[in-house]
Regions:
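Conserved phosphate-binding elements of NTP-dependent enzyme cores
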Residues: 1-183
Length: 183
């Protein structure tokens, strides 16, 4: 039978043996910059062919990992997979619905990485372990719509019993945070 590890490209089991789940092969060019070539064995899917033969509602693991968070929520909602939705919904809540499920963390901006970390705390829900969060200008580079989601997420952390300190220079955000702290 197949185990969880067969559907992860991070460990041996189901990942492509040739590229070790990277989907690409790095070719050293000695005096020039290295180049990445799509793995010929898995064709960039990162998985062994027998794993790709396994489907959930017509999609294999590679196709699912290429879905954005928003697409995955809709896909799993249609299949009544509430447990999965509960785990990925906080990513949407912090404004990261556009990220692919299998996207490498090395491709994330600093702000995106911060929001992934924030989402990981939101998914935990109420715990006895309380955390002090210090955010240094978390709105940098964010669209106004995403700033609103960020502020909602920070408020959610407070409602879960955590403490939040925000260092910010944008007057609109300072005003909104002040209003939230006065509640």
């Amino acid at each position: 039978g197949y185990k969880t590890k067969h559907f992860s490209f991070n460990v041996d089991g189901g990942r492509c043996d040739e590229c070790k789940g990277e989907g690409v092969i790095n070719v050293s060019m000695q005096f020039m910059a290295d180049i990445e070539l799509e793995c010929e064995t898995c064709k960039g899917t990162r998985f062994k062919s027998e794993i790709l033969d396994i489907k959930f509602d017509g999609k294999n693991i590679s196709e699912i990992l290429h879905m954005t968070v928003d697409e995955a929520i809709e896909f799993f909602k249609d299949n009544e997979e509430d447990k999965i939705i509960t785990k990925i919904k906080p990513l949407q809540d912090v404004g990261l619905g556009y990220l692919q499920l299998g996207q490498s963390s090395s491709t994330l901006s600093g702000g995106e990485a911060q929001r992934v970390k924030l989402a990981s705390f939101l998914v935990k829900g109420v715990t006895t372990d309380k955390t002090l969060f210090v955010f240094d200008e978390p709105s940098t580079g964010l669209h106004f719509h995403d700033i609103s989601k960020l502020l909602t997420s920070l408020q959610a952390l407070i409602e879960l019993g955590h403490s939040v300190i925000v260092i910010e220079h944008q007057p609109d955000i300072i005003q909104q945070e002040k209003a939230a702290s006065d509640k």
